[in-house]
Amino acid sequence: MALTKAEMAENLFEKLGVSKRDAKDLVEAFFEEVRRSLENGEQVKLSGFGNFDLRDKNQRPGRNPKTGEDIPITARRVVTFRPGQKLKSRVENATPKE
């Protein structure tokens, strides 16, 4: 099961006592700020969680799996995430819920 933005908003509503609308707006504003920073070429550092970085990938050779034809994979910019030590440690020591 995956955590969704709607579930995040519901959790904020329950834990902080803010209205459901405010909780939803808060979650949306947070992710919009992350998106905007990345669009502007900025790294996003979330202390105790991890870093979102931008990485430029060069063009490289590829192959069409259906035809076997060689095709170039175009250069592009990608977002990467590197978890922080605290997050790594918590995940490593967590007991998965089933």
From Swiss-Prot:
GO function terms (MF aspect): DNA binding; structural constituent of chromatin
Cellular component GO terms held in the UniProt record: cytosol
Record InterPro entries: Hist_DNA-bd, Histone-like_DNA-bd_CS, IHF-like_DNA-bd_dom_sf, IHF_alpha
Family: Belongs to the bacterial histone-like protein family.
One GO process term, biological-process aspect: DNA recombination
Ion transport keyword on record: no
Domain of life: Bacteria
Assigned keywords, A-Z: DNA recombination, DNA-binding, Transcription, Transcription regulation, Translation regulation
Record Gene3D superfamilies: IHF-like DNA-binding proteins
Biological function: This protein is one of the two subunits of integration host factor, a specific DNA-binding protein that functions in genetic recombination as well as in transcriptional and translational control.
Subunit structure and binding partners: Heterodimer of an alpha and a beta chain.
Protein name: Integration host factor subunit alpha
Gene (UniProt): ihfA
PANTHER family, sorted: DNA-BINDING PROTEIN HU, INTEGRATION HOST FACTOR SUBUNIT ALPHA
Region (Disordered): 50-71
Entries under HAMAP family matching the protein: IHF_alpha
